[in-house]
Amino acid sequence: KPTVRQTQELAKYYHRPFGVFFLPQPPLIPPLAADYRRLPGVRPGVESPEFRLALRVMLQRRELAVQLHEELGFTIPEFRTAAHMSGGPTQVGQRLREVLGVTIEQQMGWRDEWQAWREWRSAVEQAGVLVFQFPKVPLEQTRGVSVLDFPLPAVGINSKESSPGARIYSLLHELVHIALALGKEETVALREPRSDTQWMEVERFAEEAASEAIIPQSALEQQLRGITVARDGWDVG
């Protein structure tokens, strides 16, 4: 039988609350895949230890945020933007951009990419989605993940991603998945029935919608038209 000190060390090692070791029987813990969206290359139930820990921390923090809102009498902000693949990625991206309230003028005024990351993160949180960052998970496993629990869904971004631009893209990509889940277009990894090929269609949709949300095609074309390309000496056209 372990001593109190040894039990404390066990709790620290397994990243579990100290009181769990004094329960009459082990608690029933639902599979992590019952909360997060399907991820390419990640099989539900056989996640890496690093990723499992990151997910548990995300879920604990989300639950704490919900409890604090309830105990303090605050209204839990609700993300209500449902997306449907039949609408097309361009329309979904434009709708998300409207909900977040980010304008081209604001983007042009941001000092650098790190300010852009902070502004996008703040906009997503104000829309009713928690945003966390998790360390120690290799980028090859995942750059981002979303927890499809409502109200107050959550997005996790891999802090190993050194580029703020890449973090922004991952953030909006996960937001698209949350919107698709609200629209009943996808569900948690444990219950997602589609084949790998079918799922890649969902991923491509999310990629295109996220790109449109960050930089609308119309705005990009307008910016490109304003660029004057100098003729080189070899240009005889």
Map each language-model feature to its residues.
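Short juxta-domain linker segments that transition from a proline/glycine-rich
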Residues: K1-G237
